[in-house]
From Swiss-Prot:
GO cellular component: a single term: excinuclease repair complex
Localization per record: Cytoplasm
Family: Belongs to the UvrC family.
Native organism: Streptococcus pneumoniae (strain CGSP14)
Protein name: UvrABC system protein C
InterPro entries for this protein: GIY-YIG_endonuc (IPR000305), GIY-YIG_endonuc_sf (IPR035901), GIY-YIG_UvrC_Cho (IPR047296), RuvA_2-like (IPR010994), UVR_dom (IPR001943), UVR_dom_sf (IPR036876), UvrABC_protein_C (IPR050066), UvrC (IPR004791)
Pfam families for this protein: GIY-YIG (PF01541), HHH_5 (PF14520), UVR (PF02151), UvrC_RNaseH (PF22920), UvrC_RNaseH_dom (PF08459)
Amino acid sequence: MNNLIKSKLELLPTSPGCYIHKDKNGTIIYVGKAKNLRNRVRSYFRGSHDTKTEALVSEIVDFEFIVTESNIEALLLEINLIKENKPKYNIMLKDDKSYPFIKITNERYPRLIITRQVKKDGGLYFGPYPDVGAANEIKRLLDRIFPFRKCTNPPSKVCFYYHIGQCMAHTICKKDEIYFKSMAQEVSDFLKGQDNKIIDELKGKMAAAAQTMEFERAAEYRDLIQAIGTLRTKQRVMAKDLQNRDVFGYYVDKGWMCVQVFFVRQGKLIERDVNLFPYFNDPDEDFLTYVGQFYQEKSHLVPNEVLIPQDIDEEAVKALVDSKILKPQRGEKKQLVNLAIKNARVSLEQKFNLLEKSVEKTQGAIENLGRLLQIPTPVRIESFDNSNIMGTSPVSAMVVFVNGKPSKKDYRKYKIKTVVGPDDYASMREVIRRRYGRVQREALTPPDLIVIDGGQGQVNIAKQVIQEELGLDIPIAGLQKNDKHQTHELLFGDPLEVVDLSRNSQEFFLLQRIQDEVHRFAITFHRQLRSKNSFSSQLDGIDGLGPKRKQNLMRHFKSLTKIKEASVDEIVEVGVPRAVAEAVQTKLNPQETEILLQVAEERVDYQTEGNHNKP
């Protein structure tokens, strides 16, 4: 805790409000709310905390606070601050998560469509549905029953669906607005589970078709009735009153919270939303923050009712959601909340069980690897791979695994500086020398094991640099691939020998992951560099096109291909002078330029020839 924080802690009021934690760069990393700012903020800097809170506190170098009139006002302010600043330690819902809805469009001749965007456009929306497959299944059924418009044909034509009774043919339709409203109401009733009327109508049509010997049409009506029955069985009825409601439940353990939301539509449970995240405040307060963020998402329509657990502040939720808020005491609504809580507990327990198994596997893998190689447990493993094509843009990459897991903040990329042509051995010598020369100079923590993606030659080069040049004592192993480019053999020892390693063991899978990751990282870096060099080289030598304009072109068009396809006017719009834009097109499209010149020359020749022939 620095002196600035110590001084500010003395100034904290006992009022409700929001506090804002910042890191060394002044970036907001956490926003919280409190009924008593003094007690809450001081608690971060006193006593011991769990690992995740320690990680947060270790980054705090400053904080600010905003006093509010009430706890509810603090809650609303907190949600807005989180939305605006997106702090990395706060609960952040996925922006791209949305559910499909079935929509009847607000048009003269309505259409039935599936959409993920809910707009105030006068359309009727039904849902959400668990996935687009479920929405499509229901829409296909509705299309067979209700003849909504499906085409955009000109006035003189009708579409195929008109001939099979699935389109009203707006080009010749004489129906009025009342007819369409009536049909929309029937769809609404159907989706609310009030489908007996439609089933009775279909049964009547089936009987009439059978009496007139139209057996194929009767079979179609029979299939429709069966499809409705199948749909009924897929949607579990959770409430007899057929209301739309969201049911919230949550469970906390070991510093983590799981929130489950059941979407009940027309009395049927159609989907659930699950989120697991670490919490830093009181669980009920972080739950309120979650609810506020949940209904800020455009894909979450506010239902008629929202059911919440008993220990949640009902008035606070009312301030967040414009809906009827209930804390049910008994009956089927209470059972729904209990079911949501139970599912939240199960989800959290599953997460911890999976984490424990994962830790056991990775910890066991590195311990077994250490025993196999007769070295201390390799907690930190650094792995290297080279990448080049015929010696062009040679690079090397290093990935780091700590306790069997990737530590991406420690990854490093290297442009090879001293090697000309395709020489893997010389490239490996350079990158090992650069990496561990720096480790030695700056007294960095050395790895417990170095893994080279390569065979005996590359490993021996690494050994020469590490042991003979730098005088370091770090175990070095090699991973050889087979002709299918798959992890095949582990090399270790002095002299190098193939280690007897079961291909079904956890340590083999760990080494395989390391080799795949370092190869991926090296290849990705090489492609980026090659693409950049290709882009630069093709635009080099154009007068008036410096690094800044090249950068602007790439930022605007995203690729060299798009620049080639762009017109001179489009390039000028990026801020490039017309003469330079023309030079860019000439350089990138030499064949097209030649053709244009030939056409121009032919036109001149033709005009000249015509002038000679004039009397």
